Regions:
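Iron-sulfur-associated redox domains of electron-transfer enzymes in respiratory
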Residues: 1-170
């Protein structure tokens, strides 16, 4: 089994290792799932995702996953928009802070290499504390390709594999 929230990793794995396609998790990424849930509440809303990853643009545009995300901006693009409009955050009046609902630490770790696999292992251990779960993770597409080549050679039979295109994660 293989998993990742990284669209670049998923596309690379399916393209270069089509024999693994059926073993790559079809679970929706947090971006897609959040957009889909919001559109169910309000079908007329527009969803914008802002993050570090340009590959999320590809993910949002793929018809095969019906992402429900209308716009994707990278942090760099957003910064460019702020600069073009001379937005200065220090000039914006402060408002009373509204506490956010706390997510689990596992969810916050999805953007880090091995984060999704770590959350899966934690969930398995809550249900079956003695179950052995073997995990292999890689960061950077070259290392991800090496990991999948080793899996193809049978070195990771029974492992949960996770890859991230960017070193360190998103």
């Amino acid at each position: 089994m293989a998993t990742s929230c990284c669209p670049a990793w998923s596309v690379m794995a399916k393209k270069l290792f089509p024999q693994f396609t059926d073993y790559i998790s079809m679970a929706l990424t947090p971006m897609v799932l959040t957009a889909r849930l919001q559109k169910q509440k309000d079908p007329s809303c527009r969803i914008a995702f802002i993050g570090p990853c340009a590959a999320k643009k590809l993910e949002a545009s793929r018809r095969s996953i019906r992402s429900d995300v209308d716009f994707v901006l990278t942090f760099e693009e957003l910064q460019g928009m702020f600069e073009a409009k001379n937005v200065r955050f220090e000039d914006i009046p402060k408002e009373e802070e509204v506490p956010l609902n706390q997510g689990t630490g596992a969810g916050r770790g999805f953007a880090v290499t091995g984060g999704v696999a770590g959350a899966v292992v934690d969930a398995i251990h809550r249900m079956d504390p003695d179950r052995e779960v073997k995990v292999a993770s890689a960061e950077g597409l070259d290392n991800c390709k090496k990991m999948l080549l080793l899996a193809k050679a049978g070195k990771y039979n029974g492992y949960l594999l996770e890859g991230m295109a960017c070193p360190g994660g998103c």
